[in-house]
Design a protein with these regions (language model features):
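SIR2/sirtuin NAD+-dependent deacylase catalytic core
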Residues: 125-129, 135, 151-153
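Short beta-strand/loop segments at the ligand-binding rim of alpha/beta enzyme cores
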Residues: 58-63, 132-140
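Glycine-rich phosphate/ribose-binding loops and adjacent secondary-structure elements
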Residues: 137-153
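Non-catalytic, usually N-terminal nucleic-acid engagement modules in DNA/RNA processing proteins
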Residues: 1-127
Length: 153
């Protein structure tokens, strides 16, 4: 499956010389859209509105928690706010990434303790989320490179 992540270029030139928006091409081709809850919320909400008005649109919306972006800025993502947002748009979204924990601090080498703690924290978030969202089967658990494979069982 091909997934179009982010907003990308705003215009595309078709072979016949006409211009159209890249968003329109994605809609026509049915590309799944991966958009970050906080960083791309405007674009995400536009897609939600479009999907509600055009149920025939084959595009699958996938929502990322924005955990990595928040981590790079030294910020925290509020889990309950994310759940509240999920519950407002779950009717047109295909999947939601759980709110995962990135070990350590951006720009620093994480400790073995931080690396061990992060997947446990992520798993607790996942369990909390599936108890509090309207759509538990749409929540994707996240596994990071370097984490113990026991978290995949």
């Amino acid at each position: 499956m091909m997934v179009a992540a982010g907003t990308g270029p705003t215009n595309a030139l078709l072979p016949d010389g006409t211009k159209t928006s890249a968003k329109e091409i994605k809609k026509l081709l049915g590309y799944p859209q991966l958009l970050a809850w906080q960083n791309e919320q405007k674009e995400l909400l536009e897609w939600v509105e479009y999907k509600r008005k055009h149920s025939e649109c084959p595009c699958k919306l996938i929502v990322d928690s924005s955990a990595y972006s928040a981590w790079t800025r030294g910020l925290e993502v509020n889990l309950d706010e994310y759940i509240e947002f999920i519950n407002k748009i779950e009717d047109v979204v295909y999947w939601f990434a759980e709110l995962d924990k990135i070990p350590g601090k951006f720009g620093e080498i994480h400790t073995p303790e931080e690396l061990a703690e992060a997947p446990e924290f992520s798993w607790r978030n996942y369990l909390y989320m599936i108890e509090h969202v309207k759509c538990p089967k749409k929540i994707l658990p996240i596994f990071h490179q370097g984490e113990d494979f026991k978290y995949l069982r």
